[in-house]
Amino acid sequence: MAIPASRLVNITPRVISSGSTELELAGVLLTKNAIMPYPLLMGFTGQQAVGEYFGYDSDEYRLAVIYFLGFTNSSKKPNTLYFFRRADKAIAGALIGSQALGVTDLQKITEGGFIISVDGSPVTVTNLNLSTAKTQSDIAGLIQAKVTGTTVTFNTNQKNYRIVSNTTGNDSSVTYATNGTNVEALGTDVATALGLTAAAGAVVSQGTAAMTPTQTMNAAIKQSENWVSFTTVYQASTAEALELAAWSNSNLNKFLYCAYSMDAGQVAGGDSSLPGQLAFNDYEGTINTYDNGEVSVFVMSCAASIDWNREQGAISWAFKTQSGLAPTCTDDQTQASLLDNKVNFYGRYASRSEQFNIFYDGAMSGGSYGFVDVYINMIWLQNVMQTACLNGMQQTQRLPYVDRGYTMIKAWLTDPINRALTNGVIDPGVKLSEAQKAQLYQEAGEDISTELYTNGFVIRVTDPAPEVRATRGTPNISVWYTYGGSVNKIEFPLTAVV
């Protein structure tokens, strides 16, 4: 027996975290496909998984192939592609089963039963006899005969049963199956054998009334905001595209809507065309492409392929390529019209000896950022700064309204800024116009142009008003940074001196 050493030296273990998980610049595809459960934001980590779920002949798979390829010579590839149900019409509630046992095993069910609820009313299934079934469709028909008010089908891709209510709207529903009778020959119960229980991995898809594009996007971000770009699997109408653009604009530099169309108005322009309306409303957060969806998804893929931890990892979208992606613009007049309308495209250019298929030119449809790389860089930097400040506030005992506290804030912001200097989001040495210098002087109350030119960034943290301090509001914090953009065109005279 001895006196514990902790009476003299007591060490409390602690950890200073390296930080939180960063925002993933993943993409979301809105789909009307009936096999997509609502309101699940379903993520896939590869094109094969998309093909296995939606089918290899589906548009979802076709677009996923493009998304996961990234751009040629990218140092990383996209990690995740999400899908979300676009319910432009009222949809039915459904139970989407997990993979069920095969027909031979299910034939051993002769007096099966379980309880399931349809549209709020419980249905008790008894005497379910599958012994005569020859196919999965036979089994689906036998289940449907017992579960009144539903349609039951078997999905050959997912190898599961789907029980769908015959009603639609907010009150339409099908619950998980419970209380399955045990089948000794299978070593499990009926509901589990059919893949209809929560424990087995079944998914409940809620019924809903028809939703507007705005309601759809708000439902999606309730599931997760760990994504940035989005577009539609189907061709959105001009009205729907404009509403999606308005939603992106209303969310303050958080999302990028990748609109697309092959409509003649993309080339001709005009007040009623999609580019005309996008320009008129000056929406922030939308890029428009001339294509059938594939180039739009390529835009999303480029964002998801950026390696923010790599030296000069930030990219320009112009001149990016992907093997197998078909050009959507092949003549000079069309490309000139598209560029005038701020419509992007995948173009075929040619010199006398070579042809080049490239994306061009990365312009945003409206707003103040000009090009998509500027916008995406801001989304990334905004998020890492927010995360750095939150991590810092969690790890410090308190943050006083004095120089010591303000120095801590500057330190928290310095780590993201150093990363931005490394990956190319921030470029020192950018020459400012006199108008820009004047605006900076007005905002900062001093001439910061030399510091900004030299360092690429300026941080200022100052005291707030006493009444702000009394309510524990924010200090006055401003961060300015410069970005050198990217050259989209080279022109010069070639002079022979003879």
Regions found by a protein language model. Name each.
Residues 46, 111, 211-213, 236-237, ...:
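General structural signal for secondary-structure boundaries
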Residues 58, 195, 212, 329-332, ...:
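Helix N-terminus capping/helix-initiation residues
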Residues 151-153, 346, 478:
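Short, surface-exposed charged micro-motifs
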Residues 3-11, 156, 277-414, 419:
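Extended basic-aromatic, gly/pro-enriched interface segments that bind polyanionic ligands
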Residues 1-60, 69-79, 360-498:
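Structured, hydrophobic secondary-structure cores that serve as assembly/anchoring elements
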Residues 1-25, 32-36, 41-122, 126-295, ...:
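Polar low-complexity, Ser/Thr/Gly/Ala/Asp/Asn-rich disordered segments used for subunit assembly
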Residues 114, 351, 479-483:
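Short beta-strand elements
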